[in-house]
Amino acid sequence: MPIRFTKHALEKFSVLKSYGVSVSRTQIAQIIRTPEIIDCRRLPLYIAQGELDKRRVLRVVYKQKGATIVVITFCPGLKSHYEKDNT
């Protein structure tokens, strides 16, 4: 399935990098394809979550548009905050 990024999502790469957080398109694609947790409570939006590093997870907000996945945004978060959220 092809993955497309919104303008906001593309800008997010450089915003996070300015804070010292490096995220790649490959990492995002991997989390979407094999998430540790997926939150479907905000359909049609999905939130896929996967490990970013030892302390943090990466949460990816996306929607399905036909055969394409559209990444809207993504953000790192502390594992300690999200491990309690068993969605």
Question: Residues of each region from the PLM?
Answer:
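Ribonuclease/tRNase effector modules and their secretory precursors
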Residues: 1-87
